[in-house]
A protein has these predicted regions:
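Beta-strand elements of repeat-based all-beta scaffolds
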Residues: 3-9, 13-29, 33-50, 54-71, ...
């Protein structure tokens, strides 16, 4: 697939994308504001400079894990990892620490927030998230079909959203707790063509031969278009 070089929004505003050595180097928004990006020798994002000249810097360990974000004012967000490269903590600019714990399969099972409260998660034998619960016991639950497609989502209040799929695993229909239906159609290679929400409003997508999104026509009739190199 090609790289996005231009995106035209529904109002005709154009955003341009420029690349150096295959990496995104500059984004120019419809007002002419530029955001520039640099990379380290491993291709990791090293810095981002916004239109006002504010620089955010990124540092990594030898495995490519992000260790810190340093903002223009000198404040930082830092991250730690275990021997398997799983993130174990995040410290925000105010020193608040969020901690993460995993099961033997690498699934995130516990998040300890800065105030000490804990969120827990459970998984199926196939590693799919079965439930997530906060410190008060409010739980959201998920079920899946034999192909791993998510069938239901039940929120803490008992409201259930149902999903239906075709044989290829493409999402065809979502039915919310109020009976509202969102429907999806696809082309012969599985690219989404239309999305129709519960009010009957439809978005329509078109693609080039490489499968790149070319246009998205909104329910209002306005269109978003994309060009590639």
């Amino acid at each position: 697939k090609g790289r996005m070089v231009k995106k035209t929004d529904a109002l005709g505003g154009r955003t341009a994308y420029e690349y150096v050595n295959g990496l995104l180097a500059k984004v120019t928004d419809p007002e002419g504001n530029e955001t520039a990006y640099t990379y380290d020798a491993n291709g990791n994002l090293a810095s981002m400079t916004d239109a006002l000249g504010n620089v955010t810097r990124y540092e990594y360990d030898g495995s490519g894990n992000l260790l810190s974000l340093t903002f223009a004012d000198g404040t930082q967000v830092t991250y730690t990892y275990d021997a398997l490269g799983r993130q174990t903590s995040m410290t925000d600019p105010r020193g608040n620490v969020t901690k993460y714990a995993y099961d033997a399969l690498g699934n995130l099972i516990k998040t300890t927030l800065p105030d000490g409260t804990v969120q827990t998660a459970a998984y199926t034998k196939n590693g799919q998230q079965k439930s997530i619960a906060d410190a008060l016991g409010n739980k959201t639950s998920y079920t899946y079909d034999g192909n791993g497609n998510r069938l239901t989502v039940t929120d803490p209040a008992g409201n259930e959203t149902l999903s239906e799929y075709d044989r290829a695993g493409n999402l065809l229909r979502e039915i919310n707790a109020l009976g509202g239906v969102t429907e999806y159609t696809y082309d012969e290679v599985g690219l989404p063509l239309t999305v129709t929400d519960a009010t009957g409003a439809t978005q329509v997508m078109t693609y080039d031969l490489a499968g790149n999104l070319l246009t998205r026509t909104l329910p209002s009739g306005a269109s978003i278009s994309v060009a590639y190199d």
